[in-house]
Structures are given as structure tokens and as C-alpha cells.
Amino acid sequence: MKKLDQLTFDNRFARLGDAFSTEVLPEPIEQPRLVVASSDAMALLDLDPAEAQREEFAELFAGHKLWGEAEPRAMVYSGHQFGGYTPRLGDGRGLLLGEVVNAAGEHWDLHLKGAGQTPYSRMGDGRAVLRSSIREFLASEHLHALGIPSSRALCVTTSDTPVWREKQERAAMVLRLAPSHVRFGHFEYFYYTRQHEQLKVLGEHVLANHFPQCLTQDEPWLAMFREVLERTAAMIAHWQAYGFCHGVMNTDNMSILGITFDYGPYAFLDDFDANHICNHSDDTGRYSFSNQVPIAHWNLAALAQALTPMIEVEKLRETLELFLPLYQAHYLDLMRKRLGLTSAEDDDEALVQRLLQLMQQGKATDYSLFFRQLGEQAPADALQVVRNDFVDLAGFDAWGRDYLARCEREGQQQDERRARMHAVNPLYILRNYLAQQVIEAAEAGDYGPVRELHAVLSRPFDEQPGMQRYAQRPPEWGKHLEISCSS
């Protein structure tokens, strides 16, 4: 394992030049303190977890120091925000410090969020607050632990530096890791500014470094677009299967690698509500839970438009038509696993949709715990345990009979079924009220709760003695908390 000063950098994106990013030094926050760090994320850089105990660790990730090989850059991009095109966005408070190469030869972007003003700050102060930084850290590591494609978070630092949002808050920084921070909006920026040569350079960079398998295809750019579409379909299927609502699916928040990032007012569903809106700024429900699938398709169409200088329009249209079937196949596969089913039958989609409709009617069923409880006992016994959470008992009993018949046709042993279901159905889920509790403690200077919650959520499928309170249903006050976009 390496020390902080032993990391190896290879800053490929920075070498693209000033058309793609601007050199900016981070603005440090005062008297930095480490709030929480992820040893799992540190391992991606071959970084010794003990390094987090050093004073220099907080200083590095609060903007006070830089590695000699770091080349901090603010990336330029644009994007469609709530359906309207914004011609120039970019990193308004985050900096790509550089790319670290680990022993396996993998490149990891180090992106410091809350690092101060950049040319793209758009009248903002370039800061992030402790509240939003903790939320991003927890979500990044938890989604990864759930098996949902996501950026990673290495640590959060905070300080006494004040920042103003709806009220005065503490400044903080979060260090985000990802193989790339290229977004759909990067391609849109060069397309709409008619910088087609730069568009070509960007695409060749992405192809060579992230989709090299596409280079051997007859049409590498088209193969790359299909790969992006397939990865996005898989990511959205995971969101829907696990009840994750992103909240701000603008094209500048869509990763070219099909990973979840730019966490804002996200939420996991408590009770099932297909129309749940987690962002209180989303007045029309554009980014509601049920809209995430069509919005992902819309965003891919926006990316396709930006690629028209390089790919024939008709071929892009044909590829876009693959999205919904690919999504549905991924989603059904995940839901079969959540229901403990190991084979595919023609009526599986109807079985899943009937269950969700029953959940929607009463909203008394905890979405995550339902699947966990369903695997705890033999199917007939488990159905009796969860039955009282439903309003339409006759409808649930009819569904239960079909589910039992389905399980009997598979003939699984209960021990195997339980182990299989518990491996995909989390006992612990990142609920907004839990995040809010640890945020309030951290704002008061107590970082123990956020560290404990992070540790629990990093093993969401494992029963952890003494941590039962994190597996409980949320109290009524903890449901449907409105989360602001401000961060």
C-alpha cells in the first residue's frame, strides 16, 4: 500500500488542452478537519488506510496542498437542464486534480468538489456545504455496495469557513473518484458551439481510454454510442429495481460511462410511490421516480444529436430504439433476483407490475424491507408476514398464489433461497432521515454518527449486531423529506 506522496499520476484529460478545461488552483478552506473517509475507495488508489489519520490528509483534500504531479483543471461542458439547453456550464466549484494510476493500471480521476470559484462558477461562490458533501459521500459508497454503478467518494473534509445558502452553513469538500468525469454535456458543448474538431478529439479520447474495444469495430463511434446506451440502460434498471430517485437528471449530470454521479436531492423510496419527486425544485415532476426511464432515453437522444457530425442520423435512431428493450431486460433480471426467482417465464413482467400496483395502492409497504422479509422464511410463511402491509388483501392473496406457484415450479431449497435473496436485498438502505440525523451531528462537530452509518451502509446485505436501528422502517416524520438542490 502507498503513502500519500507515492501516488502515480497520468493526467490524460489535462493533456487535451485549454479548449477542454482551464487551469485553476483550489481555494483552501480554513482549519480543515476530516469528517469521514472510505478505506474501500482509498484501496482503489492503493492508498494505505492509515494515511487518513495524518494531518496532511485533511490538508490535501481541503485544498491546502497539492501533489507535484497534480494538474488541477476545471472542465467545460454544457447541458440540458430540466429540458432547456444551457450553452455553458462547466465545473463551477469542482476541480479535476489529476488521474492516479493504480497497480492494476487503472486510471482514477481525483475530483475535488467545493474547491472554490472557477471561470464556470456563474455567480456562485464555488463552495460546497457539509450537508451536501456528506450526502454525496454516503450515496456514492452505498450505491457501489449495492451493486449500482456509481462514482466513488474518498473523503469529506470540513472547516469553520462560512458559506451562505438558505442559511449560514459550514464549507466542506468531497473528493470524488471515477474512471472519467466526461458527461453527455461535454459532447453537447462542442456540438452546439460548432467546434467539431474538438468534438472529434474528445470522442477519440473517450474511445481510446474508456471504450478501446470499440476501436476494432467497423464504426467505432457508433459502437461507442451503443456501449454508452447499454451502460445507461443497466444503470437506470438498477435505480428502478432498488428504488433510487436521482432528482436532477440533466444531461450535464449524465456520465458517459453509465455511472451514477452528481448526487443532489436524491432519495431511496420508503413506501413505494411511482410518482415520488425527491427534488423540491422539480415543480412539474420531470425527474420523478417513474420518469427516470423515459428521461434517460431523452438524454441519450440529446447525446445522439451531439454526435451527428460523426455518426449517420438513421444509425443513431436505430440504436436509440434499443434502449427500452435493453432496460426492460436488465430490470426484469434484477427483479427476478429480488423475488428469489432463478429462471425466466413469460409472465414475469406481469408478476412484477402487479406487485408494484398493489404496493402503490396503500403505500404501507416498505419497498426495501418487503423483499428482505420475503426471503427470510419459506414463501408461504413470508407472504403471511408481509400481507398486512397491503390494503387490497384480496389482490395481494391472488398475487401471492401466483408467486407461490412460481416458486414451487423452481423447487428451491429454502436455505439456498434465503441466502440468494439476502445477497441482493439489502437490510440497510440510505434513507433521507438517517442522512439528516448524521448531518446534524456532524454540523455540531460530532463525526462518529456519519462514520458509523457509512460503515453500516458499506455492508448493506449483512446483518450487523447492534445496528438494528438502521434497519427499521422510517418514522412518519422521516418519510418524504424535501431535499433542496442547494449544495
From Swiss-Prot:
Keyword terms, alphabetized: ATP-binding, Magnesium, Manganese, Metal-binding, Nucleotide-binding, Nucleotidyltransferase, Transferase
Domain of life of the source: Bacteria
Active site: 252
Matches recorded under Pfam families: SelO (PF02696)
Residues the record lists as binding ATP: 90, 92-93, 113, 125-126, 176, 183, 262
Extent of the signal sequence: none
Residue stretches in coiled coil: none
Reactions mediated catalytically: L-seryl-[protein] + ATP = 3-O-(5'-adenylyl)-L-seryl-[protein] + diphosphate; L-threonyl-[protein] + ATP = 3-O-(5'-adenylyl)-L-threonyl-[protein] + diphosphate; L-tyrosyl-[protein] + ATP = O-(5'-adenylyl)-L-tyrosyl-[protein] + diphosphate; L-histidyl-[protein] + UTP = N(tele)-(5'-uridylyl)-L-histidyl-[protein] + diphosphate
EC supergroup of this enzyme: transferase
EC number(s) reported in the record: 2.7.7.-, 2.7.7.108
PANTHER family: PROTEIN ADENYLYLTRANSFERASE SELO, MITOCHONDRIAL
Protein family according to the UniProt entry: Belongs to the SELO family.
Name the record gives this protein: Protein nucleotidyltransferase YdiU
Annotated organism of origin: Ectopseudomonas mendocina (strain ymp)
Gene from which the chain derives: ydiU
